[in-house]
Amino acid sequence: MTITKQCVGIDISQDSFAACICFSESSQTLHFGETKHFKNDKSGFNQLVRWVRKQCEASVETVYLMEATGVYYERLAHHLHKLKQTVHVVLPNTSKHYFSSLNIKTKTDALDAKVLSQFGVERRHKVWQPPSPILLELRNLTRFYVQLQETKTALGNIMHSKESAHEVQSVILKSNRSLIKSIDKQIEVCKANIKKLISEEPGLNAKVKKVLTIKGVGLITVATIIAETLGFEHFHSIKQVVSYAGYDVVERQSGTSIKGKTRISKKGNRYIRNILYFPAMVSCRFNPELKTTYLRIIQNKPSKMVGQVAIQRKLLALIYTLWKNDSEYIEEYKKEVAPTIKAEATLDSSK
């Protein structure tokens, strides 16, 4: 038996991860080792590396493949990179298509790790590199900004209910107002820190300014999307970005008996969907091209939300296109922002 490729597939969660090794022989035959579970901490990472070294062929490169599931994969990916191991990180929707191609319907940690190891052997993937520290800092700030806004909204709802209730003590109302005022100050500080961080990085600042030429899109919106996608590093098509954000369309239909409403999956990055809500509303009113699109979509539709979501998707596609092409938005010149960008071509793994 001559091993030509070997890949460690890793299915990772908050507290633990499952690992399985797939071996490819010169005859193209695949075989799998046992699946082993480890804790998602430094001790578990070191145990994984020692286990892999015992299981794998020393003369053949060992690669590791995992999904970009939230932030849970990041510590392990960084740990392996520091040890000079080859790491591949794939988008969840990319691996989902591969799972579907194998007609796999069961879902367990062990099975996912096994299939991911096979995915790493059978397809070519881009080698993962640690994202820019600036983008990681930006993501921390933009997520904190969203959390502050959500806290303010929750406090506002409490305030409304207390003001409408019968004989609520004034100390409670005063305390709630004080909390909202404090949150407002923190929001302004967070916004200032986001602006400062971007302005201190000339390359990032220049690209952000070009994206800001889209009417209706503000700095916090662009900063959040760039931070959540880490500068679109692992994205090679608009379809991938749309799916990652949870804007991909789901349709439930079977013959003539079942025909449900078409909707977006929402199985994606909530921070992106959250931050695009208000810019889409503004664009529907003040961006001529997007307003035309919005009015066309909602024509004869009972709900305007269909049009709102379509504009959110459109804005996300525009931001992706301008960022990848390093260009500005030119109003009423559709060819400049058409989704046929030069970065569309990709490796097999991005399909």
Regions found by a protein language model. Give the residues of each.
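Nucleic-acid-processing active sites and adjacent nucleic-acid-binding tracks
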Residues: 26-59, 63
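Short, solvent-exposed helix-loop connector elements
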Residues: 56, 127-140, 165-168, 260-266, ...
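Acidic, metal-coordinating catalytic cores used for nucleic-acid/nucleotide bond scission
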Residues: 65-75
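Long, charge-rich intrinsically disordered scaffolds of nucleic-acid metabolism proteins
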Residues: 78, 82, 88-210
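Phosphate-backbone recognition surface of nucleic-acid-processing proteins
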Residues: 212-213, 219, 224-304, 340
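Low-complexity, acidic/Ser/Thr- and charged residue-rich accessory regions of DNA metabolism proteins
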Residues: 256-257, 294-351
